Amino acid sequence: MEERMGEILTAARDAATVPSGLMNALVYRGQGSKQVEIRPKPEIQHADDAIVKVLKTTICGTDLHILKGDVPTCTPGRILGHEGVGLIDDIGAGVTMFRPGDKVLISCITSCGKCEYCRRGVYSHCLTGGWILGNEIDGTQAGYVRIPCADTSLYRIPQGADEDAFVMLSDVLPTAFECGVLNGKVEKPGISVAIVGSGPIGLSALLTARFFSPGQIIMIDRDDNRLAVAKKLGADVVINNAALDPTSEVKKITGGTGVDAVIEAVGTPEAFELCETLVAPGGCIANVGVHGRKVDLHLEKLWSQNISITTRLVDTVTTNILLRAVEMKKIDPHQLISHHFPFSRILTAYDTFARASATGALKVIIDMAG
């Protein structure tokens, strides 16, 4: 039987077709290793499950952290990916909000809606969910994905909706908005904001910070191409910290005080320590970046400055707000998308995304039909 299955899988790869009941998937194979494999199509396991046929997905910086070995909960053999748009293929007996054929946005966070944490709006720590897609259970970089707690982990979108735009609402926009903008208290109009890192998260923080009319937004990065995008999206000042001392520049701009809110959108010790030098007394540092190494916290300098430091894993409590903002054209997620690839070129897509400074990549869209 195993020999026969191996023949089927080999034939499927050679013919670039997949037999019924099987699907293509990108699989994590240990630190630094990933490969395209033929996998069985997922099946309903619990009454609240839905099976979604994935139409579009994308690659997240967190996927790169998994490949670096920074996420020990993700073990070899796991299908990667936690973002996407698709069509409901099948539902469990307990699913009441969706029917086969519905087009849906897949949230990066799975939430039961019933446990203590979900009742507090801390969906990322749901006792049966949280960030499990592409981490503790198989994810969205595949032909199909099983979504637990479907009624509270999927969002219906119009049949004619732009799929690429809505993929940006799975993770990157809610993460930047909740963990950066809201945690950073940017909702106070007129305040000064510095965003360290102008990748997809930093640019998403820029887009959503503008909801609240901050007095000034300063973007800091080492990549002139990304800084040019930031300027186009509304940054008031851009600073290349490979060429200039960002602390001195920010102090000049703010009359020596620093900024009211700093959003860390990189996830390196150097970026976090830079944030500590940029924040004004009474200000806030909102950490969004995923850190795989320890960071020095300079309390000897900060203890008397009334500084708040926040951390958060996205809870996707703002997804409905952002859906409405996109539908009303208050925000254009296309501005975050730089590349499109068919699934057959997903390894090239990963390489392009990982070498963003050379390729100019922001978010890349993977079309599962290709």
Predicted features along the sequence, with ranges:
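Residues in the short beta-alpha loop(s) of Rossmann-like NAD(P)-binding domains
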Residues: 223, 291, 315
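Glycine-rich beta-strand-centered segment in the early N-terminal region that forms part
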Residues: 40-57, 68-116, 158
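Glycine-rich cofactor phosphate-binding loops and adjacent beta1-alpha1 units
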Residues: 4-7, 184-189, 212, 228-308, ...
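Residue-level recognition of short, solvent-exposed, well-ordered loop/turn junctions
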Residues: 45-46, 99, 188, 280, ...
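C-terminal hydrophobic helical "lid"/dimerization subdomain
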Residues: 2-23, 273-277, 316-370
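Short Gly/Pro-enriched turn/cap motifs at secondary-structure boundaries
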Residues: 16, 29, 41-42, 75-81, ...
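NAD(P)H dinucleotide-binding glycine-rich loop of Rossmann-like/cofactor-binding domains
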Residues: 112-196
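Mid-domain Rossmann-like dinucleotide-binding core that forms the NAD(H)/NADP(H) cofactor-binding site
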Residues: 161-244, 248
